[in-house]
Amino acid sequence: MRRAYPIQSEPSRLNRRARCIRPSKVGFHNFCKYVRTKWPNGRCDLKVALIGTHGVGKTTLVYEVCSLLKKAHHNVELVTEVARQSPFPVNAETTLSGQLWILHAQIAAELEASLRAPIVITDRAVLDNYCYLVNKFGRQPNLEAWLAWWMASYSLLIGVPPVEGAIPRDGFRSEDRAFQLRIHNLLIELLASPPFNNLPAHVIWLDAEDRTNWAYKIVSAAVPLIQGSTPTLLSNKAAC
């Protein structure tokens, strides 16, 4: 039986708190100045993935984060949700072929984005996409070694929690609240179990009560990473 986790209280070992520079305190222009000061010029790869179940505001949030970074004069590339381009069924009606297409398309999109900008922000990672496959077909050990290897390419993982209220209707994602929470719980379960429980990237879960400051918290958490940037596990393996 899968363990159910409360929405508002994520496992403490997954929640790495970051200092948030709030715009209400420093002003937007000072915030941009802070980002430019802490983020030195020069090319340095950084990939931040927003992970979570559907219908929680990830897509809106990635645009907000990219906007803040661009206004602070940084070269940023956005990877949008690839599932919307899938020719296969999605949501609870997904197929194994459809989920494999999404996983490969996600990786391909991230590779392309990394050629266009030193900073990449992604709407989802391969792991939360994998949750939909696990929900329908169970865990796939042969896939997980490959997925864990790719998960090492992310610099920072931002968990976006479910919020109270109905799922926004967009004509694409399922509006079934139980299905939404099942995917959320699966993501928590996978992050707490091998081979995904020892990823090099920190996982920061956002506070569901502080939606207005989410984008600023993400940027504040990402800024220090670029200063002492080190090659990712993926880069190290490629260099061997």
Where do the PLM segments sit?
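Hydrophobic anchor at the beta1->P-loop junction of P-loop NTPases
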Residues: 50
